């Protein structure tokens, strides 16, 4: 019997993750996520970080992709996509959720409401298979202006001299383009949320997670955005205006206090802000979380 929950929030954990930072991220989720959520740590660290986190936080679930002592090689391109696809399939069969949210180890929750808002939006429009920082970033930057550059990378993979990769890319893109895919369109991975319907459609799609994609030089979020189109669904914005994500690819561009004040619920990347390093950024978010008006 699948485990029932409102939202399932999964955290992929790779090698060289600082354990204290991992716990800080997990605890922020437990504080701010919807009360009926479940938290799944996906341990790809080859260092046993999942077992250590489970010991510290018995309420979390752990999926181990690499046991301690395994080869710790890691990339964020096609190889990561194949592992995330495995995670999505596992989650879809193991849990009965309405929304599947991804948070990276350099992300935090700092206000409540992100998962609840996603469930409401996707429930009101079944075509919205994935939400995230899509065409417009939280600060108003036009991300769509960057799509053509990513589109060129997609085309290079489509025309790869590796015929196995080129073949699956052509098959995937043929269906995605028939459903309105724009070359290079993509939702930023951290903070992205897929609907239950999207996860079921992806899990049933024959090419989803195919090992041949491990050779791709596309990021995991580039590939997932193509797959969302291929299964007949769409992506939508979840960061601009009063929407809950405050995410950038690299360091934060707004201070922790401004992000909390603006009502952003998920922030990325907390590795830095201005002159602050990750320790200082995380400490400031913890301070803000302890202030009653931010609770």
Model region roles, listed by residue range:
Residues 1-27:
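N-proximal low-complexity "stem/linker" segments adjacent to membrane-targeting elements
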Residues 36-46, 65-69:
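Short beta-strand/loop segment that forms part of the nucleotide-sugar
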Residues 49-98:
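Active-site-proximal specificity loops/subdomain of glycosyltransferases
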Residues 80-85, 187-191, 217-225:
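Conserved glycosyltransferase catalytic-site signature
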Residues 97-108:
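Short beta-strand-to-loop acidic/aromatic patch adjacent to the donor-nucleotide binding site
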Residues 108-212:
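Conserved catalytic core of nucleotide-sugar-dependent glycosyltransferases
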Residues 201-295:
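C-terminal catalytic/acceptor-binding lobe
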């Amino acid at each position: 019997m699948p485990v029932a929950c409102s939202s399932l929030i999964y955290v992929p954990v790779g090698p060289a993750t600082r354990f204290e930072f991992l716990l800080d991220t997990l605890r922020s989720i437990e504080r701010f996520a919807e009360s009926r959520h479940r938290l799944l740590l996906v341990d790809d660290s080859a260092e046993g970080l999942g077992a250590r986190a489970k010991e510290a936080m018995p309420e979390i679930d752990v999926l181990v992709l690499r046991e301690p002592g395994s080869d710790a090689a890691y990339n964020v391109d096609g190889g990561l996509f194949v592992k995330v696809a495995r995670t999505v399939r596992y989650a879809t069969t193991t849990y009965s959720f309405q929304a599947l949210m991804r948070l990276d180890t350099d992300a935090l929750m700092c206000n409540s409401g992100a998962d609840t808002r996603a469930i409401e939006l996707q429930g009101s429009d079944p075509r919205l298979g994935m939400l995230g920082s899509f065409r417009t970033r939280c600060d108003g930057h036009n991300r769509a202006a960057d799509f053509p550059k990513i589109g060129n990378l997609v085309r290079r993979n489509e025309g790869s001299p590796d015929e196995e990769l080129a073949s699956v890319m052509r098959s995937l893109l043929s269906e995605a383009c028939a459903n309105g895919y724009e070359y290079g369109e993509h939702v930023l991975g951290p903070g992205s949320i897929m609907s239950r319907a999207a996860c079921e459609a992806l899990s049933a799609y024959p090419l989803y997670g195919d090992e041949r994609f491990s050779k791709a030089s596309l990021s995991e979020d580039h590939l997932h955005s193509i797959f969302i189109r291929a299964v007949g669904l769409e992506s939508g914005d979840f960061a601009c205006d009063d929407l809950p994500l405050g995410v950038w690819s690299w360091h934060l561009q707004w201070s922790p206090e401004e992000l909390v004040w603006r009502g952003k619920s998920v922030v990325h990347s907390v590795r830095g802000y201005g002159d602050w390093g990750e320790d200082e950024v995380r400490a400031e978010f913890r301070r803000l979380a302890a202030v009653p008006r931010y609770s």
